[in-house]
Amino acid sequence: AKATGRLAKTDVLDAHVLAHFAEGVRPQPRAMPDAQARELTSILARRRQVVEMLTAEDNRLRRASNPVRKRIRAHIGWLERELTDINKDLGRIVKESPAWSEKDSLLRSTPGVGPILSITLLADLPELGSLNRKQIAALVGVAPLNRDSGTMRGKRTVWGGRARVRSA
């Protein structure tokens, strides 16, 4: 609302600002993810959390005193079993969907693409297959972007995009 010169902020004003934005910019409508896509995204997010916890516990184990090591090892064992179960769930969900199963097979036929990268791309980059490679690169945040103005020619840098896809 401030950009339009209004200092007040209410739901009604916000609705007007959003309507004005939609009129001028005409953003492309996007379909809401279905229940299966939300489930895949949710389980994949949990997988990332478990991997982070495993890394943290492994780091703690290196510095822990002997009495604490046994407990940390037990927790690492539990986290590894949890990770195995999560990976099985992710594979099951992908196999249950004919569209995902087909895309998964195609992605995994590429050298260097394993099950987790493939599932990450399916969950976090649903546009894959409907956009060209330059559009996908920009969406992920790996396409160099110009920073030019007038006679100034800036360095082409990559930024923004979907960090979860880049880190997969």
Residue ranges with predicted function:
Residues 1-110, 119-120:
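Long, charge-rich intrinsically disordered scaffolds of nucleic-acid metabolism proteins
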Residues 115, 120-168:
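Phosphate-backbone recognition surface of nucleic-acid-processing proteins
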